[in-house]
Each structure stands twice: as structure tokens, then as C-alpha cells.
From Swiss-Prot:
Enzyme Commission numbers on file: 6.1.1.3
Region (Catalytic): 279-585
Name recorded for this polypeptide: Threonine--tRNA ligase
GO molecular function terms noted in the UniProt entry: ATP binding; metal ion binding; threonine-tRNA ligase activity; tRNA binding
Note describing how the cofactor binds: Binds 1 zinc ion per subunit.
Coiled coil (UniProt feature): none
CC cofactor: Zn(2+)
Annotated localization: Cytoplasm
Organism annotation: Leifsonia xyli subsp. xyli (strain CTCB07)
Amino acid sequence: MPRIPSPPQAGLRARAARAFRLELTHPFRHDLLGVDQVADGFEFFTDRSVVAMRVNGELKDLATIVTTTDVVEPVTIYSPDGLAILRHSTAHVLAQAVQTVNPEAKLGIGPPIADGFYYDFDVAEPFTPEDLKALDKEMSRIQRAGQRFVRRVVTDEEARAELAGEPYKLELIGLKGSDAESAEVGGEESVEVGSGELTIYDNVDPKTGETIWKDLCRGPHLPNTRMIGNGWALTRVAAAYWRGSEKNPQLQRIYGTAWPSKDELRAYQTRMEEAAKRDHRKLGVELDLFSFPDEIGSGLAVFHPKGGIIRKEIEDYMRDRLIANGYEMVNTPHITKGHLFETSQHLNWYREGMFPPMHLDEERDAEGNVTRQGQDYYLKPMNCPMHNLIFRSRGRSYRELPLRLSEFGTVYRYEKSGTLSGLTRVRGLTQDDAHIYVTEEQIRDEFARQLQFVLETLRGYGLTDFYLELSTKDPEKYVGSDESWETATETLREVAVESGLELVDDPGGAAFYGPKISVQARDAIGRTWQLSTVQLDFNQPELFELEYNAADGTRKQPAMIHRALLGSIERFFAILLEHHAGAFPVWLAPTQVVGIPVADAYGPFLDDVIAQLRARGVRAEVDHSDDRMQKKIRTHTKAKVPFQLIVGEEDASAGTVSFRFRDGTQLNGVAVDEAIERIVASIQTHELVDTAWPA
């Protein structure tokens, strides 16, 4: 980077729309109120859009002193980091407001999350809607006061003394201990403590310098509360166990959202209103697609006949695509001996996410003495170990590679009850799970092929807006050599870049056995969903001692690619349901055509039309109920049936039908043969038909 010259009046304005980097030639400290400050003749000018900075790649408060050798990059409030800082600072204001209104409240944690923030509190009584109104008022007062966020480095002993009345904060300090590297703190708790020094953030009165409130926190934060603005709102209250464990006390969690402006807050609220209308849990009941009976258990879905049709269509299309692209379909059992997951190391890394073992096969004599030792069996959380056994079941030649094994395999994950959410987070799920075994020379081409296959298949389901995310090694949770990880990561990066899609890094986000690329899809209202994953794995073939006969006559170890295109059938079902708001493309609709006679006399004519459609594989029926015609139309419109064929005297006499579409538009007098061909074509081409075709 070129150095910025430093004449006496040199300056720089950080615009939200123009990110930049600079290398300072003079040290400076930006004051906490956001007012220009001159140090050694260099003026650094900023406005409200800059809320923090990266110094040599690390996020820092604007109050941080930098030196002449530091490389500084402003962080705007509109960037992902800037939004997280805004939301984290708003969470602090919420906590201060709670303890102002209720001094007995004890603090949990308050991290930024996607589109918002939360803070956990230990209070005697749950928060009520009236409480939220009072907190909203107090937060507004704190925001207008412009209290400064001031960072202080403290020792463990100092932190314990200052936060003696906060048991949950003391627990976090205790977890950190004197050795930051051995801390047992992770996830959202890391906003409080983690590697490095302990810090407390004081909320300071800008006029008197008095500390009004404080919290254990790593930061960074906004310079002051006034910069939070008015684009925030408290959204809901929920119960949450401390540190996510049901063994710990249950706290009260207040959720909120924060945006750079009131207009952006309103836009977000509008999106949330639309999302509520599209909520798959709501639509699943309204459209009679699936349910979660209490008698079966939490997180275990039952698909009803209409939902079963949609699911079958999703799977059938996927299966046809797999076979056409060189996959071989396999099937494996739902349970297995625990030794298999010891070999795969899943018991080392995922034991807490697995259902408890079942101790089987033990035999005893009449006196109760064990005559045959039993062993532990597990519900499988992954399919890959069993696919490895299929590969290993006989000798393999390089001529067989790439070997692509695929399965609609049901797996089981012991998700905590508080994390379960409709079909998007369940305990029993079916993956379209594939494992591809390749030579080292085939890795790059096969990975590119898989990524292309994934994108083409997703487009067939009506999803078109994608970007890619590259998840790299977690330094604390991986197996294999650093060299193999680096090689695999660079291969994935090259293939991702060549796809032409946006690529976002996800540092430390990979599973323990290899880096991965995930396909992120944006739905009809702009939300992002992680869908497909393609992951390279050098570790599993080594653990299972997989080998093939190479062209030179030697025995070599294959590389392995994990590929889950839909993620899980259940979750993908939910995503499609919300993306289409229940109005599926014709090929996925449970009922594709309903015939509605204007009077009973025209029922036989429609019966013949519907019979012709059924002969062509169309899911069609005639509504012969006693309801009036207008009620029938309302019923099937509410059920989001793509085509309603209405026949009265004129149509019956002319041998035609009249189409009514989901949006209420109509196309009248269409010849029966033409109507059938149009309907069949819309199914074959995966067309999304909501309105009348051009005449």
C-alpha cells in the first residue's frame, strides 16, 4: 500500500460506500466522541459510518492508539463487522437498562447474532410486554445520553472484585483461568472472555466522567451510545439455559435487532412479517403437509400424504439426476456397533451430538452370569463410515475411480430440545448423502464436477441466487497433517473461484476431517440458507485403510469427497416451502389440477378431462362436493393448487375448459387437448405458474 502523505491539513473521510486501507505515517488516537483530532500534523477525519477499525487485521475500538508501522482499515457500520459491533453495543445498553429498572437482575451473556442480538438475565419473574416497554424507554434515554464505551484491561483478581455480585460472569472468568489457551469458553460466550487479556467495558457519562455501568466484554464497541441511533427494537422474550445446558439454571433471554437507520429497521420488520407468513411450521399445518406428534417425540417429523408426495418428488428428481451423473445408489442400516464410530473418530468429536448407546447382544445364564459379552450400538449420525465399508468390501482398481456412492440415508442427531425448530432442526433427518472416492490426480476435476452438479440440480428446484462459502481448518479441532489441509484448502479455493460465484471465507468452520465449500442460497425474500456442502477428506480413507490398485501396480490410498446436495430432505423441504410460500412449482404441487363444475351436470365432462390428465401422470381430481362453486374456488386457492379447470355450459358444448390460476387470473375457452399439453409441459419443465399464460 502506498503511504498517505502528511501535510499539515491532510485529511481522509471514510464513506460507507467506499472501503479503503491506509498506512499511517504518524501515530494518532481517535477520540471517543468522534471529533477530529490532530497528532503530529496528521488529521484523521471520520463520520458516523466508521464505527471501528482493523489494525493489522484485528478489530479495534476507534480509541485504540496506533503507530507509524500499523496498517489501518476503517470498519463502517454497514459492513458485517460494523453491524455486529452496533448490535453488541445495543445489547450492552439493554443490559444496563435491565439493571437500572431491576437492580437485582444478574447478567448472563449478550452477543450479536444474525440480524440482531440477545442478552440473558437471571430474574425472579419472567419479563412481560409491559417490562419491554419500560426497557425500551430506558434504553432510549441511555442512547440519547451519549455514554462512552471505555475499554479497560483487568487482571482476573480485579475482574472478580468488580463483578463480585455477578455469579455468571465469575463463572466465565473461572473458566478462563490463568491460562487463556486452555479456556473452556466457546461460541457466543467468547464475546465475554477468550484467548488474550481480560477486559471490562465501562459506560461513562460524557459530562462527568463517572462510570454508570460496566460489563465483562472483549469488544470492540461503538465510541458512544448516541451512535446506536434509533434503528433498534426489542423483539421477543424466551427462556434459555445458561451456557446451553439443561443442567444449568434457566434464564430469561431478551432478543432485539439493530440497524444503522430507522428505515433499515422498518425494512427488516417488513421482511420478518413476510417471513412469518411463509413460516413452514405454519404452512405445514395449513396445507396438511406434516406434523410433530407428541407421542413420537420432539424433533421427529411425520409427513402426511400431501407432504409425502412433495417429498417423493424431491427425492425422485434427485435420484434421477444422480443416476444420470454416474452415481451408484446404496443403502445402509440405521444402527451400528460403536466400534465403527471409534474407527471413524465420530465418537471422539461428535459423541455429545449422538443418541446414547444401546447395549445389546449380552447373554446370561439362569443364575444371571454373563455368558456372552454385550456391546454398544448407536443410531448413526453419519453415513460415511458405512460407505467406507462398502468401498473396502472388495479389491478396487484405479479403473473404478471415481467411485460415486449415494444414499438417501436417515441419520440421528441428539439436538438439544431448545434448538429444535420445525423441519429445519430435527433429530431424525434424511440426507442425500454421497461419497466419491478418487485418485489424487482426479481431485480437482471431480470437485469441479460436483460443484457444477450441485448448482444445476438446485436450479431445477427453482433456486437461482447463490454464493459460496469456504470453511477452513479449526486449529483446535482437526485431524490429519497441516500439509494435507493446506493442499485441500487451496484446491477447493481454486475450484470455487473458477465457478464465478462470490466466495466468502469461513475461518475455522470446517469439520474435523477436511475443508469444505458450502453453497449458500438466497430465497424469495432475501434470506440466506446453507444448502449443499462439498467436502474433501484425506483422513477417513486413512482411518479405514482404504486402498486401490494403481496403474503402476502399487497400492494407493484414495481421497474422499463428501457431498450432501440438499443438506437434509427435511430442511430442504422447509426451505422450498418458505421460498415458494407454499405455492410450489407445478411439478412439486401435491394436487396439480382440480376440476370445478359450474353445476353437477358438467361433472361427467370434467371427469373425462381429469382421467386424460391422470393417464399422463398428472395429479388431478374433480371436486364433486356439495359446496357452491365460489367456495370450491376459495378452498382450492387457499390450498395453492396451480390449476383450477372450471367448466360450464359454454365450455362443455365447445369441448373447452377455463383455467383459473393462483393469482385469480383466468384463461377461458382453451381446447381440452391444448389444456392437457400445456399442463403436462409445465410439469416437465418445472415451471412455476402463478398467473395466466399469454393468450
